[in-house]
Each structure stands twice: as C-alpha cells, then as structure tokens.
Amino acid sequence: MRLLECSDGKFKLTDDLVRDIPRYAILSHTWGPDTEEVTFRDLVDGTGEDKTGYEKIRFCAAQARRDGLRYFWVDTCCIDKSNNNELSRAINSMFRWYQDADRCYVYLSDISASSYEEDSQQSELAWESAFRASKWFTRGWTLQELLAPASVEFFTTEGRRLGDKRSLEQQIHEITGIAVPALRRSALAQFDVEERFRWAETRQTTHEEDWAYCLLGIFGIFMPLIYGEGKAHAVRRLRREITEAMKRDDTPSHQEGMLPTLFFF
C-alpha cells in the first residue's frame, strides 16, 4: 500500500509498501463527482489543489498530525486506478488496511457544524437528525470502513469531532441494523451469512459490481474483479466463494490444522 505524508504543506506519496508499514490513519468518506476528487495522477503531477476533494485530504493530514501520526491513507489518491492489477489488489486488501489503521476518520460531507450550536439542546437534536440521514450510511464501501477499524471517529466538514463508534453506538445500531457485537469488532464469522448480506441490502455503489466487491472483506473472501459482469453475476460468484470457503473450513484436515486466530473476518 502507498501512504501519504505532509511535508512543507505538500502531500507526498510513499513507495508501494509491502512490509514494515508504519502506523497510519485512514479516511472514510463519500465520493463527490469524479472531476472533483484528487487522484493518484494529481499527486504525482503536483496538481489538483483546486479540487473540492483536496479539503478532505487536508483534514485527514491535520487530524493525523494532531493524533501523532505521520502517515495517512485516502482511497481517491493512494491507488493508481488506471492499473487494473493494482486496483484489484487494493480492493481485496482494503478490509485489512482499514482493520490495521490506528485511526479511521469519517468525514461527513453533508453535516456542517455551522448548522447547530454545541450547547443548544434543540440543535443537538438537529445534529442527530442530520447524522441519521447522512449519505455515509447509505454507501456500500463505508460498511467495511465502519466494521473493520478499532477506532472510528466522526467529523463535520469543518473537522469538528462529533463522537466515535463507541459513543454513538446506539445511534449507529439503529441506523444500520448491525448488531452491537459486530460494531464492537466481534469476529464477523460469528454472524450468519444472510445477516451479513442484510447489513448491505439497502446500500448503494456507483458501479453495480461493487455491491459484491465491497463485501469481500466482510466474508474474508479474495476473488478477481470483473467490471462489466453485472451485480447479479458478481453476487453469485461471491456466494460461490463463500460456500467453498465454508466447505474448506468444515473439512477435518483443515480443522485439525487450525490455530486460534486474531483476525476479524
């Protein structure tokens, strides 16, 4: 994975790291128009500062620095999406990248601190209403970004911290229907396959196949991406891989050789 660091007010990408990955923060957000998101090529060429999405990168860099973290990761610009092999590797690794992050910052582009007074009970109700209605809870990719990290913090567009996954646990449970133990990082394999699919059933993705691909980490599955295959075919492939994985896990030879695992799938 590549990471970002901020030096002299400029953002710089690391080499593609395989091992000895330093501590890092990671951003969770909803994408705006493609033309307004900062890309890998923008960072390589030193362009893109006039794009709306640049503000999210500035926020992530500043918050990481406050938390004592030198490095951070943002999906729009840390992956070279023109390279299909790299994109496939990244999507198959993304659950683990979020899981391994020291902190995950959720940037809520549709919640502004200017719309409420911190000490006003009425405004607090308005803030919670906006939180429950946030687009972030409707997107496919943000499901694993909620479940995988140990630390998930929510921020307004101005960078004001609203709370974290634990302090907002009840609201998140009510919004998403996800069981509280799953929000607390119980092993996802403890939850029925159909229950995990239900967590995503109302969520949307820009590319229809991504509805299946965004669930790979939720099920601990690795499979190639075939954009153009359609959602139904991608889901069938995913279900087939899940069934095969469950069969392997049930074989006596596999069970005898199993060791206790600390990974969350």
Give the predicted meaning of each segment.
Residues 168, 178-265:
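Short helix/strand-capping turn motifs
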